[in-house]
């Protein structure tokens, strides 16, 4: 089925919602080529504006707007009211050309792993004189454009419903911003495209998805091939699928998660891809430092969020989190009240509240150095006394924090200060905490991507250690058992 035919079929189910009533107008619209225009000699723009005003004040809304928060729906309607309800997409050759471009972009949403059916783009016959239908079509096109822009920035999924550990700070554009943006753009399609992630990795995923859709005609492509690792460290783990060719569903899930990453990562930043068990320090687009990591176990997963390192502590104390006290310390202390003290911890009790601290030292759970990045999860980067774990292929062992294999080398690369070379930092090791503040906070992004580009330039799939691929696809209502025909 071609895209135009698919869009026309979609139009048959497009409705406006007014209270409890649904007003269908799809079967009254006559399909027409995109290039046709409305006869302005017979339809004054003022009449279309009057109809838009009636629809707006009646409380009728395009169905595509129903998932928006109330404030965003009001913002959308206020935009039209502020311009005297003049249509954005009908009325003159110039507007008609912009409408055609918008329709084409919306109908190709599948290329970005989105669903074109979510962004109806109604077509109106050049001979159409019913101003109500034209007004409805104008509002639907505007609402679809806004929904596309918001979804491109991550609005498709309420991440907190997937997991309380997924807390990206989404930058969702308001309807007024999107529509003003499009009105001022020379090329509407390009401007709408700019709301999609611009990161290189996203573009690689998109290119591969388009290739699969063009060559297979389906999103359920061939069965993946698993190449087992070999050697003394090989074992049946999530790393076993690290050479698996990604399916279209893998691509879509990962493209969606790129929408959770800030549009601008920062000229200098740290990027931690949890399934890759790897950390990269990037300065001006170049990787200047990389190191292995140990991340959270599936039942104590490392959160997905962005924050910034503001200081580094040599010889840190570990203030045991309440969850670890409750789940690990209290059961053992119930058997032996002196368990914590015998293990080298300091226990403070005020009423029914217990605080447990581990003093600095080689046995400290944080190791000899810690990177502070304030966040709601109380998660940070740190050293570890259990360095042997870095030799493993699968490195999901922590309580949620990110353990770094070469922390002093990373700290020196972060600080970029002759006073704090790797050896200089190691000279501070002792019993007393040493706090070093960064001149400028360094952004840190803890992300989750199971499809990456290998050293050979080919995409490969990593283990889905937390099962987020399936959660994302379920949230997007994508059934992997279906055969999704590519729209060509």
Show where each model-derived region lies:
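Hydrophobic alpha-helical segments and their boundary regions
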Residues: 2-4, 8, 93, 127
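Bacterial N-terminal signal peptides
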Residues: 7-19
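Mature extracellular/secreted ectodomains of secretory-pathway proteins
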Residues: 104-170
């Amino acid at each position: 089925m071609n895209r135009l035919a698919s869009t026309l079929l979609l139009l048959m189910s497009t409705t406006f919602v007014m209270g409890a009533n649904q007003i269908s107008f799809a079967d009254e619209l006559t399909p027409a080529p995109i290039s046709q225009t409305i006869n302005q000699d017979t339809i004054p723009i003022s009449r279309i504006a009057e109809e838009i005003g009636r629809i707006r004040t009646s409380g009728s809304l395009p169905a595509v707007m129903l998932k928006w928060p109330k404030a965003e729906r009001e913002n959308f309607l206020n935009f039209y009211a502020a311009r005297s309800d003049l249509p954005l997409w009908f009325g003159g050759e110039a507007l008609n050309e912009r409408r055609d471009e918008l329709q084409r972009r919306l109908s190709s949403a599948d290329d970005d792993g989105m669903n074109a059916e979510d962004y109806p783009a109604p077509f109106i016959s050049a001979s159409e004189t019913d101003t109500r239908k034209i007004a409805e079509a104008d509002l639907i096109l505007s609402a679809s454009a806004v929904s596309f822009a918001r979804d491109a920035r991550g609005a498709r999924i309420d991440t907190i419903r997937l997991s309380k550990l997924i807390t990206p700070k989404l930058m969702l554009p308001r309807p007024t911003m999107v529509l003003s943006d499009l009105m001022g753009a020379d090329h509407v399609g390009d401007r709408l495209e700019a709301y999609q992630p611009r990161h290189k990795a996203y573009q690689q995923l998109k290119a591969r998805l388009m290739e699969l859709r063009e060559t297979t005609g389906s999103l359920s492509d061939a069965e993946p091939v698993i190449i087992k690792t070999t050697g003394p460290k090989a074992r049946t783990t999530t790393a076993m699928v690290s050479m698996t060719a990604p399916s279209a569903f893998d691509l879509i899930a990962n493209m969606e998660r790129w929408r959770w990453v800030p549009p601008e990562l920062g000229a200098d930043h740290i990027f931690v891809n949890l399934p890759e068990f790897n950390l990269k320090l990037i300065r001006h687009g170049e990787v200047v430092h990389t190191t292995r990591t140990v991340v959270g176990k599936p039942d104590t997963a490392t959160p997905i969020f962005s924050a910034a390192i503001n200081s580094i502590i040599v010889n840190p104390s570990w203030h045991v989190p309440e969850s670890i006290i409750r789940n690990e310390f209290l059961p053992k202390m119930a058997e032996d009240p002196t368990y914590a003290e015998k293990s080298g911890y300091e226990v403070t009790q005020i009423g029914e509240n217990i605080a447990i601290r581990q003093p600095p030292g080689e046995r400290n759970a944080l190791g000899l150095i810690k990177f502070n990045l304030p966040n709601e999860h109380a998660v940070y980067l740190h050293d570890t006394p259990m360095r042997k774990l870095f030799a493993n292929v699968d490195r999901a062992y922590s309580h949620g924090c990110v353990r770094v294999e070469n922390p002093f080398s990373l700290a020196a690369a972060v600080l970029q200060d002759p006073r704090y070379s790797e050896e200089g930092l190691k000279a501070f090791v002792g019993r007393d905490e040493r706090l070093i503040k960064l001149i400028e906070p360094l952004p840190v992004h803890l992300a989750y991507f199971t499809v990456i580009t290998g050293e050979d330039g080919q995409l490969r799939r990593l283990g889905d250690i937390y099962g987020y691929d399936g959660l994302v696809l379920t949230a997007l209502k994508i059934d992997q058992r279906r055969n999704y025909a590519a729209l060509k």
